Amino acid sequence: MRKVYLVGAGPGDPELLTAKAVRILSSADIVLHDALVTPEVLNMVSPKARLIDVGKRCGHKLLTQDEINAYLVHVAALYEVVVRLKSGDPLIFGRAGEEIEALSKVGVEFEIVPGITSALAAAAAARVSLTDRRFASQVLFTTAHRRGGSISLDWTHAITPETTLAVYMPGSAYAELGSTLLSSGLDPQTPCVIVACAGQKSQQIGWTDVAGLAKLTGIAAPALLIVGRVVRSEVGSTVDIWKQLQVNVWQEQQITGCRKDLKHEPRAKQYDPATFQALARHLGRRHRARRRAVGAGRRAEAHPMVSQETRFRDSRRRDG
């Protein structure tokens, strides 16, 4: 039976993959993965599977999210086991909701396999308990960026001294973050920790406080910022110690990346997005027509995702 799996790759260490994720990767026919999935995790994929990089690097996308959605629907008609592999957990800032909606519209069977999200990996690396009955009774997972890349800090009204804040994808917005947190009433000496490439060999950790966020530059991506009284410095202080971390190392990692480039099949660039979108609409109409035909409560005898490539520019030849 054809099936799509939305799999969380975790922070990058293959030992942190779930047993179920390892099993599915080992049986995959095709894997559509994000740019941040590490080579070590990709090595867990079956040798017979196709690897397609559909991620983005430094804001440059191979495919838009709409094109990825349509491509996912397309390959679901061609392969038995399709894996959409996402860094961290698919359901936390992984755009899984849009892909779930696209698959549901055309009746594709899918399953979600959770992964360890970056906030948990970063907290473990920095030895920070995100909750502590003495200091923090709630945790807020958020991001500094909106859809389209613009900076958004409209969540700061929810910050209290009893809140641990985990900021995904802070990018270069540390100065804005520091200023906004101070204006929201947070103590300037509230400790912070930034973890870059959490759970990977190139992992870097640095401590500062809210007042010191404005000084941060050249930090490698991916990074995660944790703010709150639960944060403890490894040197027993929350004083800014960034000079001890040799920021030039972070800058070098930002250039080389936290992962080595892989030799992928560059075919994701060759597909016509209009073809994917037309295919998705066609399959959606077929699925709705089939459901009307069989009536409520009856299961369709044939899978609605029967290969349609002959109607769309001989997609099997293009895919091969």
Question: Model-found features: residue ranges?
Answer:
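A contiguous loop/helix-start segment that scaffolds small-molecule binding in enzyme catalytic cores
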Residues: R2-V4, A77-V82, R95, Q138, ...
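Short hydrophobic/aromatic-enriched beta-strand-loop microsegments
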Residues: A49-K56, G107-E111, L130-S137, G185-I194
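Phosphate- and divalent-cation-binding pockets in alpha/beta enzyme and binding domains
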Residues: E40-V41, L120-A121, E176-L177
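Short, charged, surface-exposed secondary-structure boundary motifs
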Residues: H60-E67, A121-A123, H145, S150-I151, ...
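Catalytic cores of RNA-modifying enzymes
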Residues: E99-I100, S104-R127, T131-L140
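Generic beta-sheet signal
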Residues: D34, V54, V113, T142-A144, ...
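Short, positively charged, Ser/Thr-rich terminal linear motifs in low-complexity/disordered regions
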Residues: Q270-G320
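Class I S-adenosyl-L-methionine
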Residues: M1-P14, A19-I116, G212, A220, ...
